[in-house]
A protein has these predicted regions:
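Active-site proximal loops enriched in glycine and acidic residues that flank catalytic Cys/His/Asp
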Residues: 1, 78, 96
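Active-site "cap" helix and flanking loop/linker of ATP-utilizing ligase/carboxylase catalytic domains
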Residues: 3-55
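Intrinsically disordered, low-complexity acidic/polar segments
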Residues: 9-11, 58, 85, 101
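Generic secondary-structure signature for well-ordered alpha-helical cores
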Residues: 27-35, 72, 111-118
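Glycine-rich active-site loop/lid that clamps phosphate-bearing ligands
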Residues: 42, 49-83
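C-terminal structural segment of proteins
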Residues: 47-59, 77, 103, 107-112, ...
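Generic C-terminus detector
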Residues: 81-120
Length: 120
């Protein structure tokens, strides 16, 4: 898919890259030099997991559980949208030196936002 705008798949850049996709977009439109695409913290991975709506999701009420499940460095982004099944309501980004651990933590935070019980 080609999008001439910032796209959902690049939302990880908000927390993981030196220059986010939003800033890059503005720089390109304004004919400014593009910023660095490097990760903010060398030697780490930025993992993003989307929060999709379900019939029982109430993400704003589960923020504390999500931050706890995601651990240090987990960033929760809620878009303030009305909950509908399948609708993207937000995302969680975790930056970690271990990509498998980052993915596990991001998934745990999204599960907490959905109101699901921890699986460990």
């Amino acid at each position: 898919e080609l999008a001439m705008r910032p796209h959902n798949t690049g939302h990880w850049t908000i927390d993981g890259a030196v220059t986010s996709q939003f800033e890059q977009h503005l720089r390109a439109v304004l004919d400014l030099p593009l910023g660095s695409t490097q990760l903010r913290t060398p030697g780490t991975y930025a993992v993003m997991v989307n929060l999709l709506g379900s019939s029982h999701a109430q993400p704003a009420r589960a923020l504390a559980a999500a931050f706890s499940a995601g651990g240090a460095g987990a960033k929760v982004h809620l878009y303030g949208k009305e909950v509908r099944p399948g609708r993207k309501l937000g995302h969680v980004t975790v930056v970690d030196a271990d990509p498998a651990l980052a993915l596990e933590r991001a998934r745990a935070a999204v599960s907490a936002l959905r109101g699901e019980a921890p699986t460990d």
